[in-house]
From Swiss-Prot:
GO terms for molecular function: ATP binding; ATP-dependent protein folding chaperone; protein-folding chaperone binding. It comes from the Eukaryota. InterPro entries: Chaperonin_Cpn60_CS, Cpn60/GroEL, Cpn60/GroEL/TCP-1, GroEL-like_apical_dom_sf, GROEL-like_equatorial_sf, TCP-1-like_intermed_sf. It is found in: Mitochondrion matrix. The keyword Mitochondrion applies. It comes from Dictyostelium discoideum (Social amoeba). The keyword Mitochondrion applies. This is 60 kDa heat shock protein, mitochondrial.
Amino acid sequence: MFRQIANKSTKFGLRNYSTGKDIKFGAECRALMLRGVEQLAAAVEVTLGPKGRNVILDQPFGQPKITKDGVTVAKHIEFADRHINLGAQLVKGVASSQNDQSGDGTTTATILTRAIFAEGCKAVAAGMNPMDLWRGINFAVEKVVGELKTISRPISSTEEISQVATISANGDKVIGNLIANAMEKIGKEGVITVQDGKTLKDELEIIEGMKFDQGFISRYFINDAKEQKCEFDDPVILVVDGKISNVQQLVPILELVHSKHKKLVIIADNIEGDALSALIFNKMRGLQVCAVKAPGFGDLKRVNLQDIAVISGAQVISEELGVRLEDVDITMLGSAKKITIDSDSTIILDGAGDKAAIQERVELIRESLTRTTSDYDKTQLETRLAKIGGGVAVIRVGGASEVEVGEKKDRITDALNATKAAVEEGIVPGGGTALLYSTLALKKIKMDNFDQTIGVKIVRDALLIPCKTIANNAGVEGSVVIGRLLSKRDFEYGYNAQKGVYENMIQAGIIDPTKVVRTALIDAASVASLMTTTEAMVVEIKKDTPMPQMPPQMDY
């Protein structure tokens, strides 16, 4: 009997209390998640396209932030109701994942998630099997990804790079040309960084430097909470070939750096135990220090440390070479004009290494390249050569106010990431047309059952949404635009929302990176499918703790 009651409560979505938790089931659970998804997507979708609107964000400190960046808007949204917030958090995860993978397309990923999940909820409410819907959605996504790869073509010119960057920067041709020039000067594999400028104009500077794929060992070293990175001007650099675990090894160098009022970056095989704890403790007390793992493994790690030492003018500290960490003096440390360290990478700008020594190192690597017969070794040598000899392009963002610089910096970062994605996987027609025309590949698909067919239809309908939203944001009826384009059946024909005309998107320079479109669809479908097949949610019950009463006043 008790089991029957429990089953009935589950079926009808009633509350079920356990210690400190609130549990909701079935349709009620999905409806609450959908509310969060729809509200977040509504705030994000207004930014899509060249005629998309700005969103103003309240910040706990400083001035409000104005942005057209979808992921920035999504990250600022938090709902008081924890049930509704669960859905919003999942979509924020989609936007963040999309931003991490390809740097753009976050708004597209968000509205695709909403479209698939909303229709999935309706289908489940109508009695369809959630797992069959999931199979149909996944099959359709695989088919569309294959279609995107078919129509994709490699990016081939500086002009096309400029076009991709311009579109991602909301039609700003100055930004597009700036990024194209940077890539032309340092190569498509080169390092480009974006920094705040000190003038009204945007500037591009090519400086000597290198980047390697290792970040800070602990998040306690972050000194820029907004950007989640550690950034030092004019630091000294300690390069150690070996592990550091004994705090006594570090005491002399920490005292030396503190007495000289210097910022310290330590690059070593690893820093652990008491040594790491001591660094974090001293960081909390005001010492400007950051610890970074050396890049690579084995012999490659050793030569990478030597490359870093040459760039920065440091001496590699190694007991094998007869130099102990306890005996380090200031002359053995390198330096740089600037170092930027995040969780995944480190960029050393304008190191103090001797120019002749750097050139000698470059020639040594080139000589090794001519002798090697191994493809793996050749790849590693080419990577090292690019890091040492290629330099770093720095885009300095100008503007009349902090708000303007911040908004433009977001757009430049988006444009830069989108351009890198285009170089990696090629381009497709933009303006939502690539996804729109991919619906034609789904029309004649035969599935195992009706529910799976509905799953395919859910994806097919969702693929219309990006193009429709771009048109709606431009003040045009999106349904009319979609009808006209589908009747044309020309994969390069689309609606130019900036000019309000129908034309060939490739010839007009309206193009999207294939990687951006592909990952937006995959991420959106993945999370939307999981939410559609969700049958219960568990949230913490928020307890309202009363304010402590004031003590009674004493009578004197």
